[in-house]
Structure formats: structure tokens, C-alpha cells
């Protein structure tokens, strides 16, 4: 972009001459700009016309002229960035920001949060880390999961606050007597983000790929065949009834991507730009459901965000503030909730070092010591777990004191960061009982394999739970390599048989009851124990409306809205009727 190049040239000039008047020749300027003297004259004239410098020449070749830089590069960069953002030129703004990435946060601060720019409501979110590739079959991060669920549609979907699957690409579905045939009826006039018509044949191609993919196959293991009996009907024939199927088709691994262009979806927002410093979403004009109120959402990746308190930035992944720096004083928590998901401790009985009784003894020590209540983590961030889900009580372990712990145990943990404090506390506690705890860290957000899990006796990690908690926990047992890694062969076989029995129960309350009973067995045996929940919170300035927390601790991009910039607005305004 020519403007960015010109600013870069001016920055080079300012670095060498400063802001004091300087006597200089055109030849010297040409050397600074790496150009001809003729071009240097043109460039100086342009910079003077823009008010960036003053230039007083003298007649005669080789005569020195008086030059003075009138503005600092930082001032110009901020001014130009504002102009580009107001014009909606996000690509130009990104190029401008890349000139000085170390000060990106300072540059962006006045433009973050909800703003009307180029006539459209835009939300800019500062984010503290680079985002993963937005592929539903590979991503692991909480922010990425939220983004992908915004970009891609499924045959069904899970809405914020609603645990039952809702229509999405399919407007209705039917289940045969016996549950072996499911038909999903597609909406007409569906469109991909690139404007191309979305066809049943394309969805069939995508589903056939998902049937064989290691990430999605566990969710679709009961599917014998997928067919297209009509252009607007997807048919699933099962070899075993699976009354979770409508839930499964709304999960991330089963979202529908374009069969030939996987980055293209059919969700409410499309991916307009995906750069290391900027991810930009734009409203999908051909979306088949109610359109979002916001037109554009931008993630500006600013790893050097200032930390001025737990609620002042996105540095902590369970604290999100929507707004610019000047708004932070006005920003108030608009939504708070305790996560249904939790960080957990898993015992690897398959490894053979810990017996079930020793595992129960270890859990008893943790519970009786109050370890989780005394972690050096603010109470506003975590809450010790007493239930796996509401009503699924974590049992208190009681075992004879004379059961000795092994002399040495190995613990493997992965993010989030709070788990590091748990490992330190565990080392101290177990040392008091003659057990040395070796701690290893894995930087990934998902266990890689059974071989990785086999290295450890104890495992610490977190488990996100979505809008349909019971369905999420059932899928966790199927999809996470943790279970095959920690369960003995007989327990693993028992788990598979239990899941097959549960999925065939047509009555949802019965499925929930049986699933709870199985998890109660796992917790009683100390195989899995939730440790603490997160306290999710979103803060926003008064002008942002409709900010609603999702189960994963983000907010529903389709519900947030921003009033247009009128002089006066009535108090207590409500969003327009749909």
C-alpha cells in the first residue's frame, strides 16, 4: 500500500534527522530514501503537502535547504490507522499496524470494542495469543472452538442456553420406529460463504469423509450408511440405534464444511481475513437463519496486552473485556457464570503403579487437606468442584490410613496455567506421605495418544462442557484418548458396552440416569475427579448490548448489538424485534 510505504520512508527520515530544523541537500535525502534526486524532490513535496514536514529550499544546485519533521511517526501512524479503520479498510490497517508491532496495543486501543465504522457495526476484540488453524477436525482452543461454531453450520445446532439440538441446515428430522433410520430434511436455497449454492450432494461428500476421520468417526460409529434419497434429504442408516445422533451432528467434529474448500462454511459469519495479527469475520449475506446484528467482528492479536487487573484484558482466558482502554473504567461485568466444565485429575490404573485403593487414598488426602481451597489463585477465577454436573455429587473418599502410597509417582499435565499451581501443592502434600511426585508438562491442549498417557500415573487437564452437558460427557468418553490410556482392558470393554447400551435408550431421562450412574462409578473408583470450575465473566461498556455468555465462556456473536451513533437514545433500549 502506497500510504504505508510513504510512512515507512518518513519514519526512516525522522529516525535520522529528528524533529529539529536541519540543513540538508536533495542528494543526501535521496541517499536516505534509496532513490533518485528527482524522486526525492517529489517525495519531499508530497510530505510537505500532507503537513508532515516543512521544507525551505534555496536556489542553486547542491545548496542546502532547511527541513524539519513536524510530526512523530507514532502520531502519524495512529492518525492513519484511525482513518483506515473508519473507512473500513482493514487490510490497510493491518499493514499499518505491522510497521510497529511492538506498539500495536497502543495503536489499537482507541479503536477496540464496539464501533460504527464505514456505516457498519463493528466489534474489535484484543486477543492475547495467536489463534490455531480454524479447522473443526484439528483445533483444540476454547476461542477457536467458539469461532468455528460461528463460521460453520451443522445439520443441527446447539443454541446458547438450550441443551436440546435445534434445526440448522436441516429444518426437521424424523426417526424411524426402532431408531435405525434418521432422515434430515434440508432447507432450500442454502448458500456457502462464497455465494455458491449448498447442495445435499456436497453434504453427503462431507459426511462420507467424516465417517472415516479419526476425530469424527467415534461420534458416527453407529452409522452404517449415509445416502441422499432426495436432493433435500440426508438419510442415516444405523447398525445400532443411537438416540444421541441429533446431538452428535451439532458437535464441532460433525460441522459441515465445503467438501472441496474446507475453510468455507455456511454459518452466520464468514472468514474474510485470517492473518497472524488479524482475524476478521464478516456477516454471511446468504445465512439461512436470523442474521446477526453485528456486521463485522475482528480479533486483533496483541500478545503484549497490558495487565491492569484480572478484568482488564483477555490475558486470562476466562476474563473477556469488550472495549477500548478508555472504556475500562466504565466496563462492568454484564454476564457471570460458573463453567459446567472443570479441571480434573485422572488416575492411570492401566499403568500398574497405582492400585484402585491407593488412588482412593490419594483422593482422600486431597479432599481432607483442603488443597483446592488454598491454591494461590483468586476465588473470582476458580471454584473447587463439589459436583461433576448439577446433581452429580463427587463422592468423599474413605479408606484405611494404612494403605501406603507408592514411593514415586509421575504426573503429566497440560494447560490451563492454573494446573501448575496444583502440581506444586500436590508435590508438597504427597511428600508428607512418603511419595515423591515427578511432574512433566505437555504444552498441547489435547492428549495425543495412549503412548503419551502411558508415561504417567496421574494426569491433570481440563474438560470443556458445552450447551448440552450430558451429551458432551458421553462424547468425551468416546473421543478422548485419555480413556483408552488409563482404563484396564476389562474396564475399557465395560465402558464400550455401557455406552452402547445407553445410546439405545430412546427416553432421554433414562440415558441421562444411566450415564450419571456410570460416571459415579468412575468417581467412586477415583479414576476421574473434577477439581475446580472456572468463573466465566464478560465485561462490556454501557453501549454494548445483548452480550450473552456461552457454555464455553465466550459470548454469542449473533446476539450482541451496538446502537447506531445518534445524538440521544432512550434509556433501557431493547434490540429490534426479529
What are the functions of these language-model segments?
Residues 18-22, 41, 140-142, 172-215:
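Aromatic- and charge-enriched surface segment that lines or borders ligand/interaction sites
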Residues 126-175:
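N-terminal lobe/hinge region of extracytoplasmic solute-binding protein
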Residues 286-328:
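Ligand-site clamp/hinge motif
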Residues 216-262, 266-275:
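Surface-exposed binding/hinge segments that line
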Residues 282-285, 335-361:
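A bilobed periplasmic-binding-protein/Venus flytrap-type ligand-binding module shared by bacterial periplasmic
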Residues 130-144, 196, 246-251, 539-558:
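A structural "hinge/loop" feature
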Residues 58, 361-395, 421-425, 454-578:
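Detector for C-terminal structural segments
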Residues 22-27, 33-39, 51-57, 399-462:
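Ligand/substrate-recognition segments at binding pockets and active sites
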